[in-house]
Amino acid sequence: RDLRMSRGLGDVYKRQMLLYDNTKQEAYMKPHIHTITELAIFTAIAFIFSYIESLFPLPIPFPGIKLGLANLVIVLVLYKNGFCQALTVSIVRGLLNAFTFGSLFGFLYSLAGSVLSLIIMNLLKNKTHLHISAFGVSVAGGITHNIGQFAVAAWLVGPSGILPYFPFLYFSGLIAGGLIGAFVLLCRQRIPLFSSTN
């Protein structure tokens, strides 16, 4: 009888531990699933913006200059989810672009610009004592994004052939970053999902 009782208590203990482990695992997985789902949605939106922008190129006689609507999503993710998540969205979006309507070289340009601009934007965003707004961060990101792309082009074809092109890239990054920054401020003021972020 004592042996049966001991086995019964052991079974109850095992069931309780199994239930505890399952509950603990669910509590651990829920925020991760939410984050993955959220980033997937942001990536899809950024990809759609890139695709729409590819259908309506700007009437400018300089190749590669565009507004970069997808960067609106990237900057918002940077403020809401942080650097790593913004970088993830940017890289996955770049890969989707390359596999659908882009090219390998286009992905290299995009990757260089995205990584450099995100590093700079993250540094400026975290320098809270400088009081740099999301608008200023976005402007810096627009400029450094084009600088990163220029660096890749200079490495591939040589700097002498594209050096005269640099001022146009600089000012286009300045203008695009300003426009994106204005939209970022508007989204953070009007959309509750982003309004509580730093």
Q: Language-model features: where?
A:
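Hydrophobic transmembrane alpha-helices
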Residues: 29-77
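Residue-level signature of transmembrane alpha-helical entry/exit and packing/kink sites
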Residues: 31-42, 67, 71, 86, ...
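Short helix-perturbing small/polar motifs within transmembrane alpha-helices
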Residues: 39-41, 48, 89, 110-144
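Membrane-embedded alpha-helical hairpins and interfacial helices in multi-pass inner-membrane proteins
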Residues: 103, 107-108, 127-198
